[in-house]
From Swiss-Prot:
NCBIfam families: bioB. The keyword S-adenosyl-L-methionine applies. GO terms for biological process: biotin biosynthetic process. [4Fe-4S] cluster binds at C56, C60, C63. [2Fe-2S] cluster binds at S100, C131, C191, R261. Gene3D superfamilies: Aldolase class I (3.20.20.70). PANTHER family: BIOTIN SYNTHASE, BIOTIN SYNTHASE, MITOCHONDRIAL. The keyword Transport does not apply. This is Biotin synthase. Binds 1 [4Fe-4S] cluster. The cluster is coordinated with 3 cysteines and an exchangeable S-adenosyl-L-methionine. CDD domains: Radical_SAM. GO terms for molecular function: 2 iron, 2 sulfur cluster binding; 4 iron, 4 sulfur cluster binding; biotin synthase activity; iron ion binding.
Length: 316
């Protein structure tokens, strides 16, 4: 890494961590200016379908879908293509640009991968970008999905490499990185971010931003922990709104030209929810999340337009 890049990472991270809330406005101004420079007034929307839920073999401490924890998460096998496409059509109707098939588990079986490929092919035909979040995939599996029309592969690194073992022991940070590198080799766009408020430090956040910058990801999902009863993190105190905004600012300043996408946990922002845009976010996940309820598409569109911004719904 170039010395000047390392220097800016440390400078911004230290500044954001230690700055008093009353002095955060200068950073917000800077983050907003960078967002407008690279992204203009466009806000990109994505939506997901929880296409296979529950009974996951992995032990991610924040996740309700792990078979190791007793939660109220729904359990069902892979949805049929028609049901997935129906949900994609609903999202497209409201100007959502990207639609992702998300499944529980370490990775899909060969039969599941084939069915997902057929669903991707159908989604592509309706004029919305097909994305997928399918766990840990090999190069040839990603090539198959790309050839079916997949545009972007998602695989969250979740946190920094040094903190990762505190939240997951059934697979390694390097396993996720391998999946993302495989996707890069195929020419696919890649999406990777994580969950915040899981016990990580500001150094972990800085390291994570640095790693994603080096990996040259296109989209960074920012999720704020929603503690779920039955998981190891059920007693974690949610982040306060100002700290959540600082995280968005950090990622915008370190990854100025990338999509900073606010996803799960938005309700914790409360009356500061509208500040996500001036803090640097240029993308949102809309609709429901995997195991928690989100906002309806129409509500998010009104939310965006109320701030003088517009939905980026153009699919080239």
């Amino acid at each position: 890494m170039k010395p000047e890049i390392q220097s800016s990472l440390e400078y911004y991270s230290d500044l954001i961590e230690h700055m008093d809330d009353s002095h955060i406005y200068s950073l917000i101004f800077q983050a907003n200016s960078i967002r407008e420079k690279y992204k203009g007034k466009k806000i990109e929307l994505c939506a997901i379908v929880n296409a296979k839920s529950g009974l996951c073999s992995e032990d991610c401490a924040f996740c309700a879908q792990s078979s190791r924890y007793k939660t109220n998460s729904p359990v069902y096998s892979l949805l049929e293509k028609d049901e997935i496409v129906k949900k994609a059509l609903e999202a497209k109707k409201y100007g959502v640009k990207r639609f992702s098939i998300v499944i529980s588990g370490k990775k899909p079986s060969k039969k599941e991968l084939e069915k997902i490929g057929n669903s991707i092919e159908a989604i592509k035909k309706i004029g919305i970008y097909p994305c997928a979040s399918l766990g840990l995939l090999e190069y040839d599996e990603i090539c198959y999905l790309r050839d079916k029309g997949l545009e972007r592969l998602h695989c969250n690194i979740e946190t920094s490499e040094r903190f990762f073992s505190n939240i997951c022991t059934t697979h390694k940070f390097s396993d996720k990185v391998k999946t993302l590198e495989n996707a890069n080799k195929t020419g696919l766009s890649i999406c990777s971010g994580g969950v915040f408020g899981i016990g990580e430090s500001w150094d972990d956040r800085k390291e994570m931003a640095e790693f994603l910058k080096n990996l040259n990801v296109d989209s960074i999902p920012i999720n704020f922990l929603t503690p779920i009863k039955g998981t190891p993190l059920e007693s974690k105190k949610p982040l306060n709104p100002m700290e959540a905004l600082r995280i968005i600012i950090l990622f915008r300043l370190i990854l100025p030209d990338k999509d900073i996408r606010v996803c799960g946990g938005r309700p914790l922002l409360g009356e500061f929810a509208s500040w996500i845009f001036i803090a640097g976010a240029n993308a949102l996940m809309t609709g429901n999340y995997l195991t928690t309820t989100g906002r309806h598409y129409s509500d998010d569109i009104k939310f965006i337009e109320a701030h003088g911004l517009e939905v980026d719904s153009v699919v080239s």
